Amino acid sequence: MRIGHGFDVHKFGENGSGPLIIGGVRIPYEKGLLAHSDGDVALHAATDALLGAAALGDIGKLFPDTDPAFKGADSRGLLREAYRCILAKGYKLGNLDITIIAQAPKMAPHIPQMRVNLAEDLQCHMDDINVKATTTEQLGFTGRGEGIACEAVVLLVNVEQG
């Protein structure tokens, strides 16, 4: 077994700055997150957790933001590619727990679809995926509505043992 932790944060752009995509779900909101890819903090944190657990570096190593090929990239595709690397190393997902930290918008209505997307991309049961959201009670940059942060913890199991 191996445990990995991931973290990601992006700041909001101006009003009308583009879609807000979290957990592979387009969430209605007046601002999008600024990023080289689609800015999906949940999938970026999950990808980092997976790569870290397998000692494969991080999302920036595998998908550098200096590479124009990843400009505007769909983070679900990045997650699937990272998971292929995990499988190739002889591991599979045990479980994934994600915490989205945002004052707004409310994530609760979108969490079921996020779980569906993650289970599909990681070839697992929805029971292996947990997504939750919290605020910082209006403290810090997330509390002021300047951006969204996310943490993820993953357990990988050896394919031969799992």
Swiss-Prot record:
One of its GO terms (molecular function) is metal ion binding. Its EC number is 4.6.1.12. Signal peptide: none annotated. Keywords: Isoprene biosynthesis, Lyase, Metal-binding. The keyword Lyase applies. InterPro entries: MECDP_synthase (IPR003526), MECDP_synthase_CS (IPR020555), MECDP_synthase_sf (IPR036571). Its cofactor is a divalent metal cation. 4-CDP-2-C-methyl-D-erythritol 2-phosphate binds at residues 8-10, 36-37, 58-60, 63-67, 102-108, 134-137, 141, 144. It comes from the Bacteria. It catalyses: 4-CDP-2-C-methyl-D-erythritol 2-phosphate = 2-C-methyl-D-erythritol 2,4-cyclic diphosphate + CMP. The record marks 36, 135 as: Transition state stabilizer. Pathway: Isoprenoid biosynthesis; isopentenyl diphosphate biosynthesis via DXP pathway; isopentenyl diphosphate from 1-deoxy-D-xylulose 5-phosphate: step 4/6. GO terms for biological process: isopentenyl diphosphate biosynthetic process, methylerythritol 4-phosphate pathway; terpenoid biosynthetic process. Gene3D superfamilies: 2-C-methyl-D-erythritol 2,4-cyclodiphosphate synthase. A divalent metal cation binds at residues 8, 10, 44. Binds 1 divalent metal cation per subunit. Homotrimer. Belongs to the IspF family. Involved in the biosynthesis of isopentenyl diphosphate (IPP) and dimethylallyl diphosphate (DMAPP), two major building blocks of isoprenoid compounds. Catalyzes the conversion of 4-diphosphocytidyl-2-C-methyl-D-erythritol 2-phosphate (CDP-ME2P) to 2-C-methyl-D-erythritol 2,4-cyclodiphosphate (ME-CPP) with a corresponding release of cytidine 5-monophosphate (CMP). This is 2-C-methyl-D-erythritol 2,4-cyclodiphosphate synthase. It comes from Yersinia pseudotuberculosis serotype IB (strain PB1/+). The gene is ispF.
